[in-house]
Amino acid sequence: MEMLPTFWAPAECDLLTGTTLAPALTAKLNSLNREFEQLREATSSLPWCAEQWWDEVDGILEFDDWLQVDAFYRSRALEYPGVGDCMVPCIDMANHSSGTGTAAIYEVDDQGNAVLLLRDGKTVEENGEITITYGDKKGACEMLFSYGFIEDEMESARELFLDLSIPGDDPLGRAKAAVANCAPGFKIVESGDGVSWDGAYIWLICVNEEDGLSFQIQQTVEGNRELIATWKDEPVHGFEDFRSILEQDPLWDVYHLRAVSVLQERIASQLQDLYGSDDQVDAAQHGDGTNIRERAWHLAKRLRFLESELLEKAYSYYEDEVSWRRGPLSEDLHSFRPDHGVH
């Protein structure tokens, strides 16, 4: 577990600058700090906890212990069909191998017991290793974040998540942020020769009052006040499916092109951050006698390469799409700035 990024030294974390793992790691560490303080507050009034855990001199519980608890669970929990996340003795110690290298699968039998089944056509020699898959479709960032490694056979980052923010000069910005019930960003997924994307949040950035989006304060039957979003006078019940509403609009092609323009600008911004820190990462002293372990440096370099490849592919792919869709729609886009929401 020592290679999980939550255990990396500050100098090692700096190697992740420009990758999608950097903000995810910062958010995770902040979350773990809050959880640890909540644990302290909830238990410090218990005499034995105050003495054994939190005593300033003899207390044995430290933040690193909470990191260990998180790592045990995050790197070993498996999602069992119909049950959810579980830690199963022995099975949770099996190593990962994807594709044809996966020797066994984990299932739940008729009695609700966790079982490990050899895959059809597979054999395991005596004293051989039984491997499972942690998820063949998981991206490089998630694999490094959750398990502390990237498969040698992985040739693509597979997917990545880029955050977005509603621009500060958006007149409806505060209202949009208040009603948004979706992740603030979008996911890019490699799909054959192309790249697909998904993210409801981007549509909040792409439309405004002049398009038909508005907000009103409404009183509920309980007497409370709540903010209600409407699209062309029709209520919007959550923005996860807002795209399907926009697709029915005569100006759908305009909204779609706006979204792709925002997406492309955000990808360009991420590439700039990634390439802008390359020299610093390359020059970082690593190995024995330094603050950067050899393995951490190589993992960071590998992630940077894989994510840059996918970002470059996505930028080129959507540049072609923007050029193809622009033209007759350029006049409609004139007043829309695609750098909105881009960091």
Locate the predicted segments by residue.
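Short, charged beta-turn/beta-strand-edge "cap" motif at the junction between a beta-strand
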Residues: 122, 132-140
